[in-house]
Amino acid sequence: MAAKTAGGGRWEVVKKGRRPGAGGSGKGGGGDRRALGEANGVWKYDLTPPIQTTSTLYERGFEKIMKRQNKEQVPPPAVEPKKPGNKKQAKKVATLTNQNQKQGRFRSLEEALKALDLADLQKELDKSQSVFSGNPSVWLKDLASYLNYKLQVPPSEPTLSQHPHDYPYSLVSRELRGIIRGLLAKAAGSLELFFDHCLFTMLQELDKTPGESLHGYRICIQAILQDKPKIVTTNLGKFLELLRSHQSRPAKCLTIMWALGQAGFTNLTEGLRVWLGIMLPVLGIKSLSPFAIAYLDRLLLMHPNLTKGFGMIGPKDLFPLLDFAYMPNNSLTPSLQEQLCQLYPRLKVLAFGAKPESTLHTYFPSFLSRATPGCPLEMKKELLRSLTECLMVDPLSTSVWRQLYPKHLSQSSLLLEHLLRSWERIPKKTQKSLQETIQSFKLTNQDLLRKGGGSNQDVVTCDSACKSLLQQARGFQLPWTRLLLLVLVFAIGFLCHDFRSHSSFQASLSGQLLQSSGVLPAGQQACTKIYSYSLQGYSWLEKTLPAWGSHLLTVVRPGLQLAWAHTNATVGFLSAHCASHLAWFGDSLANLFQRLQTQLPDTLNQLLRSLRELLLFLYHSILLPTWHMLLEALAQIQEHCHEACRGEVTWDCMKTQLSEAAHWTWLRLQDTTVAFLDWALAMISQQ
């Protein structure tokens, strides 16, 4: 509270000549409240506009108590020269003060909240609102001061890491939450200044040796940021400057980080803004890194649906995290580094966003530049996985790789070898684009080897990997030409050896085999017939071809000559009058072909994708339910047959059941027909 803050949190003995209103209030409580900037005089810069200074009712109440106690504790004038009496009186007052402090502390926050008198709190707030009706910031400060004064428990560490994320607000009763939220709604325009007041007051209390517990201010901060997280995220630059100004005081830095981090537990986007703007810049500081990583872990654990955080992390944020996670001998301890490694895959998903097929090529250059032969093994594995993902998901990554290839030969050799090892797991579409890219790399390697540019060893390694990849891409193919030639040579050699060893074809094994199988006689007969028919055909052509040829030439020649003349005239006319139109038509046709080549594959792919979705819809919506219904019907029929046949299904039983079913169907059809006829006759008779 303001009065308690001004008084240092203790009752003090006021000497006779001292004015009781010197603690920050005027006479009778009518003075002005100190401005927030004055109360927070520790800061060397003005972060927010000053709040209008005025006293609060709660301060006045404390000042009246202090005045009454001071009047009782100030000795009378006649006894003033007696110093021993003054010392005894001072010791008694100090003892009473310590007892009052001890009585004001509870063993736990649960006990303090149970002992809190909500009626008294509401009464004080009503008084504050009636007296300071035009100053909502006073109401809020009274609320925070009252809660913090009443909720005095043994101090805890600044980040409350042993408690749930919403502690201490999670312990607040429903009635107290209603009071707090109602007052925050009434003073909605002063919430930003109230947040600054709570934060700065907490930091001031940390400067005091027997400082108070700060649960009242913590509860107010959590209540504000549950509904208004942008109070923090719109002023991250201001709070980062504040954090850096207290870098030598870890307790204050952790308190600031805890307070700002409360904005992220209800909204993943705001939480990532706080972490990237406040905690990432201090990652690596020994006293602050554990809380920063623990907060990120808790934030991602509370928001498993990462889609709301897409677009928050960019390349400038992801790659410092990659270096922190995988580079050895950095400012993080091994345990924190391992924890960050476990969080990195989810951070990568957040960075790639909702459309990785159009964004991954922007990450490819940084991934490739880090994949050096000397980088740590775990980092190398992660980089190669990320590079492969870029090539498989974003088609533009291959063109980016082509541009970077001549200046990143050592990194490209590692990636090529990794692609060779994992070629079978790469989709066919990606394999095709990679094959074209590797073919261009092969030409680049030949040019570099011929010119002697770059490191020859890197070029040789890349060239070898490219050749292996191209061979792997083509796959294993049988040399059919060589196999046929080999079979032909083997057959000719076998026949020659067979004929030579048996002196004749009839005596050879081949001849005997062909004779016994009937192939040789059939072949001889076929050859005889072919020969005779060929002779007959030749003789017929020899007789008829000259006569028919001369007759055909006589009939067709005039028409052909006339057509040739008309064709020459038409071509001459077109060449003389339509040359420009023909050129335009040729250009248009070429453009049309080019457009079809570029757009038709996408259209066909879209058509095939739509057809696939239609077939899947038909399968899931019609075919699969129909199939299940058919199976259920067959199961019911089988069960009915078992019941009708008393467990033993025979053909006679099946015939009986089928005849009964047919008879029942026929009767139902007759009944339906008779009913329809009766209805029709009734309708006709009515008309």
From Swiss-Prot:
It is a multi-pass membrane protein. Keywords: Acetylation, Apoptosis, Endoplasmic reticulum, Glycoprotein, Membrane, Transmembrane, Transmembrane helix. It is found in: Endoplasmic reticulum membrane. The modification N-acetylalanine is found at residue 2. Residues 1-36, 68-94 are annotated as: Disordered. Glycans are attached at residues 267, 305. Pfam families: TMEM214. Its main location: endoplasmic reticulum. One of its GO terms (biological process) is apoptotic process. InterPro entries: TMEM214 (IPR019308). It comes from the Eukaryota. Belongs to the TMEM214 family. Constitutively interacts with CASP4; required for the localization of procaspase 4 to the ER. Critical mediator, in cooperation with CASP4, of endoplasmic reticulum-stress induced apoptosis. Required or the activation of CASP4 following endoplasmic reticulum stress. This is Transmembrane protein 214. The gene is TMEM214.
